């Protein structure tokens, strides 16, 4: 019988195997040193929900996902508590395929990317910041409410994040939901009560999320403001009864009176892609910074951030005085970031559909509007203007009022009576 000779002696084979195993082990150790297992004890989950602006549509992404994954020692994560950013679909099968092939063609800039970075900078190192989007583009609030596919998918993602956290023995809490929806309810004229439906969806989410997470604290909404009035085909700025302002005015009313609503900011100060409806990446980041400020306020238990909104309207003869909550920072007029609007965005519309505003003057906390006639029973408005079908800070509905801290005034439509 012929005996096969080994290429290497047995001892040498063992030595080579050991060397290879050591090399593999060193690679694994090196990899793990770059991707340390989390030692964090708390997961703060702050997702965004709404329609196309919540999903960042058309906002060309400027956030690099590798950099986002590495930011703050990897503490910014998705609903799976990983760094697989940029994949979204309400269809689970489609989402699986997108993740499998790392499909990022429709991965846009989201406000929550910048929000998460701001929060990670301000919050302790033992805390993960969990972010993800939910909702559906071009969809009215009625089709995003409880029982709809987007709503249930959003709850599924929250449940996934909670289960991942608890499997690791970590505390999990949702301090707030970022709300970015309203454009479709402005332009499509649905026969619904937006004010009532927005309050209801927050109540539903609050109850459903607490049922998942078992947290005791309520979950407020951090609200932007949709400003796309001119995209509505029937919009006329001087129409006394202006249906299109009902949605943006809802945000002002709730920020004024409801403790469960906090402010980020309006969208009109930012450029819109093609001057249509979607704010660009810089606008998304700006909204994200404002949202982070409110989330931090919620976490710290500070006074509620309501944004720059009117808190009172009075008349003195032919002059209207509008009071604002300026939080100690004076009002200013800015025609650099936002192109100058007529009367800096203010108008006073009487029942004859005539703008009777003549001039405005500001001091640290109030705006005084001088009118051409007695303004009793008129509508005082801000940022209710713009060119037909245009949006954004150049030709869309806009105004030039902000405070010295950079908070832009919310669009509003208030009766003087």
Q: What positions do the PLM features span?
A:
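N-terminal hydrophobic alpha-helix used for membrane targeting or insertion
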Residues: 9, 24-25, 39
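N-terminal secretory signal peptides that target proteins for export/translocation
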Residues: 1-17
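Bacterial N-terminal signal peptides
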Residues: 18-30
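Cell-envelope and extracellular/periplasmic
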Residues: 38-417
């Amino acid at each position: 019988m012929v005996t096969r000779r080994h290429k290497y002696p047995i001892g040498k084979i063992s030595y080579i195997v050991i060397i290879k195993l050591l090399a593999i082990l060193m690679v694994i150790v090196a990899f793990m040193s770059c991707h340390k297992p989390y030692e964090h004890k708390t997961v703060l989950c702050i997702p965004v929900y709404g329609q196309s602006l919540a999903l960042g549509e058309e906002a060309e992404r400027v956030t690099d996902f590798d950099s986002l994954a590495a930011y703050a020692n990897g503490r910014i994560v998705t609903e799976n508590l990983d760094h697989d950013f940029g994949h979204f679909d309400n269809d689970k099968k489609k989402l699986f395929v997108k993740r499998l092939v790392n499909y990022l063609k429709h991965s846009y800039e989201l406000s929550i990317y910048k929000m998460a970075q701001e929060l990670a900078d301000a919050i302790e190192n033992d805390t993960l910041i969990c972010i993800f989007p939910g909702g559906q583009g071009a969809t009215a609030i009625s089709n995003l409410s409880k029982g709809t596919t987007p709503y249930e998918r959003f709850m599924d993602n929250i449940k996934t994040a909670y289960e991942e956290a608890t499997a690791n023995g970590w505390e999990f809490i949702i301090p707030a939901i970022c709300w970015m929806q309203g454009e479709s309810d402005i332009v499509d004229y649905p026969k619904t009560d937006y004010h009532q439906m927005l309050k209801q969806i927050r109540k539903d989410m609050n109850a459903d999320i607490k049922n998942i997470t078992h947290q005791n604290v309520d979950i407020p909404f951090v609200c932007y403001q949709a400003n796309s009035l001119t995209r509505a085909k029937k919009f006329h700025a001087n129409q006394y009864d202006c249906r299109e302002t009902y949605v943006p005015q809802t945000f002002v009313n709730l920020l004024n009176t409801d403790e469960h609503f906090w402010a980020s900011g309006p969208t009109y100060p930012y450029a819109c892609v093609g001057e249509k409806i979607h704010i660009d990446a810089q606008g998304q980041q700006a909204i994200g910074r404002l949202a982070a400020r409110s989330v931090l306020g919620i976490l710290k238990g500070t006074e509620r951030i309501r944004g720059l909104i009117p808190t009172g309207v009075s008349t003195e003869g032919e002059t209207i005085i509008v009071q604002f909550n300026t939080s100690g920072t004076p009002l200013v007029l800015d025609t650099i970031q936002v192109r100058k609007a007529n009367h800096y965005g203010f108008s006073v519309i009487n029942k004859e559909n005539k703008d009777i505003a003549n001039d405005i003057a500001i001091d640290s906390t109030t705006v005084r509007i001088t009118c051409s006639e007695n303004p009793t029973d008129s509508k005082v408005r801000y940022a209710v203007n713009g060119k037909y079908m245009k949006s954004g800070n150049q030709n869309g509905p806009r105004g030039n009022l902000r405070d010295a801290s950079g908070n832009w005034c919310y669009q509003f439509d208030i009766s003087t009576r």
